[in-house]
């Protein structure tokens, strides 16, 4: 699963996801993409589950780019622990997603297969997404 090799700070505050994503909002590498419509937090496990689903659909054909990375730690206190006594230990990693962000990109396959694969992958994610094509510039 995806996780950073090193981080400057082990623990982070939660914060809020306001606004839309300007960076990473266009299909850059492939021909087709999966774009976030709502904001949310994707765990490394959810990203991996979507990746496996896409790869199962396209089999050997095509290339896949994962345009997001989980570099925010989420902490958790042990079960049956009283309140207080500091912040819990990092349990897993998340990627904070705003509307407009491209999550996955694909190329080397036909549009119908790409749309089916990305649609099935979207069921594994806790946010609403849409299928997008590269705009002809």
From Swiss-Prot:
One GO term of the biological process aspect: translation
Cellular component, GO, one term: cytosolic large ribosomal subunit
Region ranges (Disordered): 1-24
Entry-linked InterPro entries: Ribosomal_uL16 (IPR047873), Ribosomal_uL16_bact-type (IPR000114), Ribosomal_uL16_CS (IPR020798), Ribosomal_uL16_dom (IPR016180), Ribosomal_uL16_sf (IPR036920)
UniProt keyword annotations, A-Z: Ribonucleoprotein, Ribosomal protein, RNA-binding, rRNA-binding, tRNA-binding
Keyword Cytoplasm part of the UniProt annotation: no
Coiled coil: none
Pfam families, per the entry: Ribosomal_L16 (PF00252)
GO MF term set: rRNA binding; structural constituent of ribosome; tRNA binding
Compositional bias ranges of the Basic residues kind: 1-17
Classification via HAMAP family: Ribosomal_uL16
Function of the molecule: Binds 23S rRNA and is also seen to make contacts with the A and possibly P site tRNAs.
Family: Belongs to the universal ribosomal protein uL16 family.
Assembly behavior: Part of the 50S ribosomal subunit.
Name of this chain's protein: Large ribosomal subunit protein uL16
Organism: Leptospira borgpetersenii serovar Hardjo-bovis (strain JB197)
Taxonomic lineage of the native organism: Bacteria, Pseudomonadati, Spirochaetota, Spirochaetia, Leptospirales
Gene symbol of the encoding locus: rplP
